[in-house]
Amino acid sequence: MQESSQEEPVHYVQWFYLSNYDLYDETSSMELTGAQSWRRFLNYDNNALEAKYNEIITEEVSQEPNQKNVIVGISGLHVVNLPTLTLKPLYWPSASKNDTLRVVRGLWMYEDTGLPVINELSDMLEEGYQEVKPYAVNWDNVLKEEEEGKDSQDDPSVLSHKRNKSSKELIDAMQWPLKPTSSGKYVFYEDGYRALICQGGLLSYFSKGTQSRRTSIKGMPVVRDFPYFEDDGFNGPKQVTDLFLVVHGIGQKRSETEERFLFTKTCNVFRSLIQIQKNIMKEDPLIRNDYEPQLLPICWRNKLNFNSYIKPVAGDEGRVEDEEFEENRFSIEDIEIDSIPAVRRLLGDVMSDIPYYMSHHKESIIKSVIREANRVYHLWKDCNPYFLENKGRIFIIGHSLGSTVVFDILSLQPTFVKEITIDDDESCFIFDTNGFFCFGGPVGFFLHLNQQSIIPRRGRGSSRYEINKNFINSDVPKSYTYDGYDRYGCLAVDSFYNIYNHLDPVAMRLNPTVDLSFSKGIHPTRILFTRKSSSILRMISHSNTDPVELRSYNQSLQQNKNNEPTAVVPLEPEQTVELETRNFRREERAKWRMQELNENSQLDYVFTSAHGVISNKYLSMLSAHSSYWSSEDLACFLVVETGRNFGIANSIEQFRGKHMPRIFKGDSS
């Protein structure tokens, strides 16, 4: 039993959030179904929330809105706004019920469940606690005096609290009415740590509850103290080494709501897969010890309105200048037919991207992507100052037409950018991009349309790193690269990947856009990490359940020196390609460019979605374009490629471009 004291006892305050996922589980997709429950913030975040709360109530904090926020979670992706007691995503807009969560400052909790008392009731309990001051009562002395028939005025400890009060009167004094008063409910404070929420009137005779340790009163017990866990293993968000920014396509249907929601949802799922694969691979010697990836969506689409019309200019041919003439304005949704929704969704949200991007909307699309990416990066840099100090790397993932938009931006991006403020320019990213991953994009179509090839940017690429000097020569003819940022297809990146599902109707190969002749001898690399499956259908359809063993390029070279065969993932049946003539100079240039654009000497990577025993490629194509976000193989590929040790020597042998045997005219073989 606690000793009585004239001073209020020290209590541990515990903050909670109402959610169906765990902020401290980095593998959570944040899109779980099921009922929400109260979860506690771990000590690091809990202390930060309580400190900020005390600053606000004592007016020691700035009145700026951002100064009343606290970043929380193992990944630091969410923020608690203390005035509103809500938890929201920090880097992307809230678009679903799982995005905006309720937060409570747990000063009082239910003794039976350990859950916090809701804010309104907690405030009433605390108001009564401060008025009654139950911690100042010594119940042992009161009851002892009652039994011995002594005058309570002889005891100064009781006099100081309630002079000339009998034990019955003291019990009444320890009660505090709860609003609304018509309900008859009240709280009975037993001491400085425990109280009972009780029913008044006739209901008190029929109520079932816990009996007070002091009197015959029954009620629901609540306590003003939470258990403190000395070490919960969380010491703040992890320090990220590699940041992925994901840019989506246009997506016309319901763009203001569903499109934005679906995009953030798929990013949450893919982030979860990346974290799972990182944990699986963390003991692999090929992966850097400090590797810590993070993925953020770039939600640029909700800033644009494609249903807006260009205001007619006086004198335009074909324009009716009569102000009384009312234009007939309609949107895509107005002319869309309701039949075959799955197919029309693909056509409406994907296929229509290309004509939209080729219209007058192109410039506004590019600026919107740049503006949102710069905003997210600027916020990331402010919240994670260590990222620049540790020279963190940035990778961009572009999906569908989003890859084409990013391709346009990186073609006009300066080779290197200096730190500028977010308002300085909307023409380029305010950060340097280390690598660009194209997911199912029609980039090849636009290269063909512009009659341009992919060419390395001078000063970027594999050859600029000292660690690669034994594998690629940096002293090459000027024609091998392009010096400037005014050429379509010349990207300001060090590595470029074109990844596609082989059933994706939108995706295109890009190896031929570097050199058509040379690309005929290169197979696209298959992304394949076969694992044991829990599905009977997958076990039947995939006979090989042994995981693929990864090896570095350097290990393979060493094995070749020792005359040991190099085991690689089988790609396609070997073919021979007949060329008219063998141009050694062109072949050498193409080989150098492929190595410069990607340390694997390969741009094209293909994967296959998991199917059962029976599958139809024409039906599968409807889901193939969105299959990237649920592919474990693709997530593992990104982890390996961005998490492996630096340099060509440490590139993965299975991912390197493989050349088919070729026969040239004039060969004697």
UniProtKB/Swiss-Prot annotation:
GO terms for molecular function: metal ion binding; phospholipase activity. Its main location: cytoplasm. The active site is at S400. It holds the Pfam family WWE_2. SMART domains: DDHD. GO terms for cellular component: cytoplasm; cytosol; nucleus. Signal peptide: none annotated. Residues 463-644 form the DDHD domain. Probable phospholipase that hydrolyzes phosphatidic acid. Belongs to the PA-PLA1 family. This is Probable phospholipase C1020.13c. It comes from Schizosaccharomyces pombe (strain 972 / ATCC 24843) (Fission yeast).
